Amino acid sequence: MGKLIAVLLVWWPFMASSDNWFPVTVQADGVTQPYQPLAKANKIWRICALLPHGKDHYWWGVAWGLSEEASRLGVMLGIYEAGGYDQPDKQRAQLQQCRQKKADAYIIAAIAADGLSPELQQLVQAGIPVIDLINGIDGDNVTSHSVVSFTDMSATALRYILQQSTKPIRLGWFPGPKGAAWVRDADLGVQSLIQNGNITLLNAGYGPPDAFHQAGLTRQFYQDHHAVDFVLANAVAAKAVAQFQLRNPVSQSPIVAYYANPAVIEMLQMQQLAAAVTDSPVLQARIAVDLAVRSLQREKVPKRVSPQIEVLTPANLADFDLSRLLPPDEQWIIRRELLDIPAQD
């Protein structure tokens, strides 16, 4: 962690101010255009944000982006994290807690794509905005999606790998937690490119994106497969594989992460990863807050807004605006209760 702090201290002065993150280029309902958020909300709306967990530093950046944009717009925001992808009941309970608090709108990074369908249907039918953030929610029970396709993310990562080799490759694949919409979509992206016959896919198995589970999958994978040409992995597994390779030089192979978090950025800087794809999660969080406020103010919003996918390498990392991906140095996960409606005299 000390090395990561040193890296961020070098880069942070060059990162964009949180008040100057816009305009940014996005795909809005399939059209490439600049995204310009509101200057301020027209009242102090109360918004509830639900995240799957705070174990992966990826979500630290998301929580920070949510909090910063809510502050900039002048709205109240509660931020809840369920504790893991094995905690769907807790996320459902947190949703009910926000309903009891009469939240005006919801921003949800769902544990499962269909895990909250009945509750979300009730909210949308009542005219309460629901914004799908990052993970993906199935069906029509959302007002808008602030997401990047993980099908495109994993496919972009795999295309990068294919550009590095003209020979058939054995690919180690560490997808992430089974049942999550983003992992399902990432699987689809990989499957879409292995039909050319040049890839032998070796699936390491599914598991929660925490260090304990991904390290276990890594050990088992290398017991079953002593050598591969490339590894394509979720961000937490990418670190687990890199650490395993440092201890076991015979297992060396280039690693590509199909999304990025602070640990991935550190490993890129140290040249322990070949590349990583980023979906700019802080931007997605900021956009989600803006979409929620616009919806509350009866503005027409796009059904889907997606920042551009970018491939980061040790060579181009210094040119990337890290404020799209990372919170400031020493910023941890933000958890915050949604304040109750003030009592009327």
Give residue ranges: language-model regions.
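Short beta-strand elements in bilobed, periplasmic/extracellular small-molecule ligand-binding domains
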Residues: 71-87, 170-173, 191-212
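Hydrophobic alpha-helical segments within soluble ligand-binding/sensing domains
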Residues: 145-171, 185, 213-215, 260-264, ...
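Extracytoplasmic "Venus flytrap"
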Residues: 25-37, 45-65, 69, 78-92, ...
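Hydrophobic alpha-helical
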Residues: 105-124, 190, 207-267
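Flexible loop/hinge segments that line or gate small-molecule binding clefts
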Residues: 113-152, 163, 261-269, 273-274
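N-terminal signal peptide c-region/cleavage motif recognized by signal peptidases
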Residues: 13-15
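An alpha-beta-alpha
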Residues: 47, 51, 66, 155-199, ...
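Hinge/cleft segment of the Venus flytrap/periplasmic-binding protein
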Residues: 19-40, 283, 287-345
